[in-house]
From Swiss-Prot:
Post-translational modification: Binds 1 heme c group covalently per subunit.
Protein name: Cytochrome c
GO BP term, example: apoptotic process
Annotated gene: CYCS
Disulfide bridge positions per record: none
Any one GO CC term of the record: mitochondrial intermembrane space
Length: 105
């Protein structure tokens, strides 16, 4: 998997405007990501998801995030996440490594 420190920088640059990762963190434009791994799409308590997210029915893990983060709108058509995606596999791996650590602390 990727480099946690590099992944943290990517999160700060590309994700933190809309997401938090800490336990009890607030929802912003996007949901708080604490407990992300092993959770089904559209299930963060208290966040208003699109039906597309609620109905996707996959469980978040390294493989599903790798595919989703490349092109969110292709993976979940109808998502309200406006982020275009991260094309470089290495950058996605770094971000996922960071998320894996940060969302369970």
């Amino acid at each position: 998997m990727g480099d946690v420190e590099k992944g943290k920088k990517i999160f700060v640059q590309k994700c933190a405007q809309c997401h938090t990762v800490e336990k009890g963190g607030k929802h912003k434009t996007g949901p708080n990501l604490h407990g992300l791994f092993g959770r089904k799409t559209g299930q963060a308590p208290g966040f208003s998801y699109t039906d597309a997210n609620k109905n996707k029915g996959i469980t978040w893990g390294e493989e599903t995030l790798m595919e989703y983060l490349e092109n969110p709108k292709k993976y979940i058509p109808g998502t309200k996440m406006i982020f275009a995606g991260i094309k470089k596999t290495g950058e996605r791996a770094d971000l996922i490594a960071y998320l894996k650590k940060a969302t369970k602390e």
